[in-house]
Amino acid sequence: MRRAAAKALVLVLALTSLGLCLPDAPPALKPYPGTGMFLLLSDIHFDPYADAAIMEKLGAKLREGCPASGSASFPKFGKDANYPLLKSALDEVVATAAENHIHYDYVIVTGDFLAHSFDSRYRQCVGGGDEAYQKFASDTLAFVDGMIAHALPGVPVFAALGNNDSDKGDYAEPSTAFLHSVGQDWSRAWGDLPAGARAAAAASFERAGNYAVPDPAVANHQFIILNSNRWAAHNARACGETDPDPGGQFQWLGDVLGTVKRAGGSATLVMHVLPGIDAMRSSMGQPQSLWTERCTEKFVAELTAYRGVVREIYAGHIHRDDFRILPDREGKPLLPIHIAPSISPIYFNNPGVEIGWYDKHTGELRDYATFKLDLTLPNPTWTAEYVFSRAYGHPRPDLAALKQLSLEIHESSPHSGVGEKWANYYTVGTGPFLTPDNWMNYSCAQTEITVAHFARCKQAAARPRP
C-alpha cells in the first residue's frame, strides 16, 4: 500500500512539474511572480425582452404577443443571455476572486453587449421611432455596464463595440447620438485617467467608436480599442476605392501607434470582429473572410510596420474559445490573437468567462483560466474548466506556444490527443461540434488569414501523407 501511495505521489509530482492539469483539479488562481490578474468577457448579448421587469426598468413595455420568459431560469441553447445568466457570471467572478484572494486590475470586454435581432424585436415588441430606439439601445447597454460596475466597483473596464452594438442595426454604423451616450457611460469606467486623456478618448469614441487609454497597471502601455466592425466583410466597400479608410480608422491607428513607439511604449489591441477566416461559414461552402481582404492587407501592413509595439490582441465575435496567429507581410507569424468565449449560449456553446494573468512589465498575456456554466446539466453551476498552461503543457499562450499548439491540433483529430482536448474547450464543453469532416476548416483558420492561403492549407491537408 505504501509503495502504491509513493508511486501515486511521484506521478502527481511529475505531472505537476510538467504543468499538466489533473482531471477536475481546480486552478491555482494566484498571481505568478511579475504578473497581475484581469477579467475577460465577450459576446454577452443581453436580452432585455426576456424579462418584463427589466423592460420596465428600461422604460419600455412589451406588446401583447411578445411574452417574456421571466427571470427564474437560465436560457436554453440557441438563446441569448438573460438577466439570471449575466448575473450568475458576474457573481462567479466575484466569488472566485474572494475565494482566492485575488484582485482584478481591469476588465476587458470584446464587444456585443446587445442581443441578436435587437432592433427588429424592438419594432415588433415595443414600437417607437428612431429616437426612442436609440435611447432604448443605449440604455440597455448602460444597464449591462451598471451590472458590471456593481459587481466590480472601482475596477476599470475597457470595452469594444460589437457588430450588434448599434442603434442602426447589425453591422450598421451607430449614430453620433448613440456613440455620445455610450462614450459618456464608458468613460466613467476607465479608472483614474488624466483629464486630458479621458477627454481625448471620449472624443475619439464619439467620432468613430475607437479610443486609446493608458493601461492602469502597466507603465507606458496603451489599450487601443478598435471599432473593427468598420472592416468587416459585411461592409463590402470597406478599404476599397470608394471607402479606402472607413472612418479614418487606419490613419488614427497609425497615429496612435506612432505616438506609442516614439515614447518607447507598447500596446494591446482590443476588438470585436477579428481578421481572418470565418471557419463556421467556410465549413458550409466556399471560404469566407471575416474582414474584407483589402482591410486585412492594410491591417497586416500596419502591424508589420509597428512590429514589437503591439504585444497582444484580444477579440471575440465567434462565440468560441480559440486563437489565431496573425502573420506579417511576408507570411511569418507576427502576433497571437486571443479569442474569448461568449457568455451567450445562442450558438449552442456553454457560457464562458476567462480570468487572465498579464505580465506587469509588458502587458502580455501570461496565462488564463476558463470558467463555464454547463447548461447540459439539470442544475447548472459555474465551474473551472481549464488553465492554459496546465491543459496544454506550454508555460504561456505566447506566439511560440500557439505556433506549436496549432501544429499539434492540425496533426491531431477531435477524437485523440491534444485535438480532442481543444475540440472540447472550443465550445466550452458542449460536445462534438468539431468532426473529422470539418476539422481542417477550424485548424487552418488558426494560422491562415486569407482565403487563398486557407484554401491551400486545406488542399495540402487533403493530400495523402507519404
Tell me the role of every PLM-derived stretch.
Residues 1-9:
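Bacterial N-terminal signal peptides that target proteins for export
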Residues 8-19:
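Bacterial N-terminal signal peptides
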Residues 22-109, 179-236, 240-263, 305, ...:
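Metal-dependent phosphoesterase/phosphodiesterase active-site architecture
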Residues 40-42, 105-112, 153-162, 268-272, ...:
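Active-site neighborhood of phospho(di)ester-bond hydrolases with catalytic His/Asp-centered motifs
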Residues 47-50, 115-118, 159-170, 232-234, ...:
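Active-site environment of divalent metal-dependent phosphoester hydrolases
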Residues 62-68, 75-172:
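Core catalytic region of metal-dependent phosphoesterases/phosphodiesterases
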Residues 130-149, 179-200, 291-300:
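Acidic, His- and aromatic-enriched active-site or binding-groove loops in soluble protein domains
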Residues 233-250, 258-310:
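Active-site-proximal segments of metal-dependent phosphoesterases and phosphodiesterases across multiple
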